[in-house]
Design a protein with these regions (language model features):
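Alpha-helical transmembrane segments of polytopic membrane proteins
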Residues: 42-52, 98-106
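Juxtamembrane helix-break-helix junctions at the cytosolic face
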Residues: 55-69
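Membrane-water interface at the C-terminal end of transmembrane alpha helices
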Residues: 107-132
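Short juxtamembrane and helix-loop transition motifs at transmembrane-helix boundaries
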Residues: 27-40
Length: 133
């Protein structure tokens, strides 16, 4: 039973990260509606996917160092919430902006928390191996 829980805690943040990164990449497809030409479209895709590239690199690092994923995904969620709050203060507040926070920042927070739980569990297991009872 413990082994199944360990596998679940290990794989869940990684799989959710991949799904979340692909979800964010879908938002860049709106650049094709702009009729920018070939190079303009390439530049637009690159600009829209900068967060995707950053999170993909973070996932790659986090595969072995879970604390990095825990911190960065949590900070990414906080950054998105902060950007949305600034936008809400600048523009007129609209209720749909709050739902965007749940849709984008919520999974980032969840992934960050799962990476931290995985890191803590891994640390606990390493200490148990070093100092047997």
């Amino acid at each position: 039973m413990e082994n199944k829980i360990n596998k679940f805690i290990y794989w869940t943040p990684r799989i959710l990260s991949i799904i979340f990164i692909l979800f964010l990449a879908v938002f860049s497809l709106d650049v094709f509606d702009e009729n920018l030409g070939f190079w303009g479209t390439i530049l637009g895709l690159f600009m829209h996917n900068i967060p995707v590239f950053i999170l993909a690199i973070v996932l790659w690092i986090s595969w072995k160092r879970e604390i990095v994923g825990g911190i960065i995904f949590t900070l990414a969620g906080l950054l998105y919430v902060a950007i949305m709050v600034v936008n809400m203060l600048k523009n007129q507040f609209q209720l749909y902006m709050v739902s965007w926070n749940f849709i984008v920042a919520g999974p980032a927070f969840l992934i960050g928390i799962l990476f931290i739980i995985n890191w803590l569990k891994k640390r606990k297991n390493e200490k148990a191996v070093v100092a047997p009872k």
